[in-house]
From Swiss-Prot:
Residues 291-301 are annotated as: Calmodulin-binding. The CAMK2 protein kinases contain a unique C-terminal subunit association domain responsible for oligomerization. It comes from Oryctolagus cuniculus. The gene is CAMK2D. Expressed in liver. It is an enzyme of class 2 (transferase). It holds the Pfam family CaMKII_AD. It catalyses: L-seryl-[protein] + ATP = O-phospho-L-seryl-[protein] + ADP + H(+); L-threonyl-[protein] + ATP = O-phospho-L-threonyl-[protein] + ADP + H(+). The active site is at residue 136. Residues 337-375 are annotated as: Disordered. This is Calcium/calmodulin-dependent protein kinase type II subunit delta. It comes from the Eukaryota.
Length: 533
């Protein structure tokens, strides 16, 4: 039997140094090619953890990166497979993110923005000429070759890039990053190269004023803005921007992809090709100031998403929101109404803990550019977990009014207290709110274990989880009850409502039972002493 030889070319030819970045299945480290002393960045992928689909994506990324050779694109120099690992050896770019460099500059003008977007357009044009659509153009993927003044802008991360034939339009899946998605992707229409030009329009808008054209903390409303092309050029910051710059943005942010400007056409636009005479040279300090806040918000959001659901331990106090100076809050939805304002202090949440949340946001620090199908699904699943937490908070607080707002009037339920019967409507549950929950002032803490969310189309979802309820019994001893729950949610008029639930195990919210002289708890009356929703 012939012996198999394991490839060790990377191990033999390269020396690894410090870590530069990390993702779910990969790490990026500085490395040196031993024979030449040349330094590179090695993206090291743990292939033992990859699915067959992930292997295909890795092969596609390597194939695309090998094809693209341009001064404004981070170049792939080598692709090596070894036992359990795959190594992609890229240019070592040391200048950091373009947007971070801009805010450190003493002088920044419209002409500088023109030069930045020109380099981005050059990279996009090269991709499109080679039949590649990047699909994830955003600030995190725009790097500088070095820290030297005037260093080249380099487009990075082709993990979502696809290969297309000419001007082919097809449905390649929901991919990208929310604020940079094009209307056609959100409509789930066939798409192609124009999606990159839409993202360029968003980037150019930010380069000129320091905040994005489309903004809403609520992803659904953000998508509605994008699909409607609902952006403008508000005063006073846009008053000092030349008409030619606005014209180029309008051509990039054209809703109809067939009429949207191409990369090659954009490079010929007067604001790019005749920068010296067309673009303003005035220093834009307000843009720099706004961009600092924009960068801080991006970094904060990434950090929050990374740690958000490791464990969530909420205060037993009522939800509070401290409003920082200058932040406008919509009290109904706790939405920041302007992207130019300061970063809001997060609201405290009810006393519910989510543990081991496989369906929540677990962002890698590599980038937020997982497929938006994954991203969108994660966001929608998180919405379901959130509204489930709110429902349980209403139960814990004995707040029947809040409960009825979250539940459908025709709510159906199977639960132990109904003795196998299907309960319909709110009257069965009203009894417990009025006679038990409202009279209980004992602290209650609920833990949701292992929530799993199944999305059923756009407007329906099912969540299954284990619910642990901690409380103090009549003698002051700590107790815990467990139930297994499934809830079905339906979205009507943009609002999620619980339409059905099925619960097994113990009832979930304790009511202090009477005590008999020997100290033993009396559960006479059966389960009617326990809240059952």
């Amino acid at each position: 039997m012939a012996s198999t030889t394991t490839c060790t070319r990377f191990t033999d030819e390269y020396q690894l140094f410090e870590e530069l970045g990390k993702g779910a299945f990969s790490v990026v480290r500085r490395c040196m090619k031993i024979p030449t002393g040349q330094e590179y960045a090695a993206k090291i992928i743990n292939t033992k953890k990859l699915s067959a689909r992930d292997h295909q994506k890795l092969e596609r990324e390597a194939r695309i990166c090998r094809l693209l050779k341009h001064p404004n694109i981070v170049r792939l120099h080598d692709s090596i497979s070894e036992e359990g690992f795959h190594y992609l050896v890229f240019d070592l770019v040391t200048g950091g993110e373009l947007f971070e460099d801009i805010v450190a500059r003493e002088y920044y003008s419209e002409a500088d923005a023109s030069h930045c977007i020109q380099q981005i357009l050059e990279s996009v044009n090269h991709c499109h000429l080679n039949g590649i659509v990047h699909r994830d153009l955003k600030p995190e993927n725009l790097l500088l070759a070095s820290k030297s003044k005037g260093a080249a802008v380099k487009l990075a991360d082709f993990g979502l890039a696809i290969e297309v034939q000419g001007d082919q339009q097809a449905w390649f899946g929901f991919a990208g990053t929310p604020g940079y998605l094009s209307p056609e992707v959100l409509r789930k229409d066939p798409y192609g190269k124009p999606v990159d030009m839409w993202a360029c329009g968003v980037i150019l808008y930010i380069l000129l004023v320091g905040y994005p054209p489309f903004w809403d903390e609520d992803q659904h409303r953000l998508y509605q803005q994008i699909k409607a092309g609902a952006y403008d050029f508000p005063s006073p910051e846009w008053d000092t921007v030349t008409p030619e710059a606005k014209d180029l943005i309008n051509k990039m942010l054209t809703i109809n992809p067939a009429k949207r400007i191409t990369a090659s056409e954009a490079l010929k636009h007067p604001w790019i090709s005749h920068r010296a005479t067309v673009a303003s040279m005035m220093h834009r300090q307000e843009t720099v100031d706004c961009l600092k806040k924009f960068n801080a918000r991006r970094k904060l959001k990434g950090a929050i998403l990374t740690t958000m659901l490791a464990t969530r331990n909420f205060s037993a106090a009522k939800s509070l929101l401290k409003k920082p100076d200058g932040v406008k809050i919509n009290n109904k939805a706790n939405v920041v109404t302007s992207p130019k304002e300061n970063i809001p202090t997060p609201a405290l949440e009810p006393q519910t803990t989510v543990i081991h949340n496989p369906d929540g946001n677990k962002e890698s620090t590599e980038s937020s550019n997982t497929t938006i199908e994954d991203e969108d699904v994660k966001a929608r699943k998180q919405e379901i977990i959130k509204v489930t937490e709110q429902l349980i908070e209403a139960i814990n607080n004995g707040d029947f009014e809040a409960y009825t707002k979250i539940c459908d009037p025709g709510l159906t339920a199977f639960e132990p207290e109904a003795l196998g019967n299907l309960v319909e409507g709110m009257d069965f549950h009203r009894f417990y709110f009025e006679n038990a929950l409202s009279k209980s002032n004992k602290p209650i803490h609920t833990i949701i274990l292992n929530p799993h969310v199944h999305l059923v189309g756009e407007d329906a979802a099912c969540i299954a989880y284990i619910r642990l309820t901690q409380y103090m019994d009549g003698s002051g001893m700590p107790k815990t009850m467990q139930s297994e729950e499934t809830r079905v949610w339906h979205r009507r008029d943009g609002k999620w409502q619980n339409v059905h639930f099925h619960r097994s195990g113990s009832p979930t919210v304790p009511i202090k039972p009477p005590c008999i002289p020997n100290g033993k708890e009396n559960y006479s009356g059966g389960t009617s002493l326990w809240q059952n929703i």
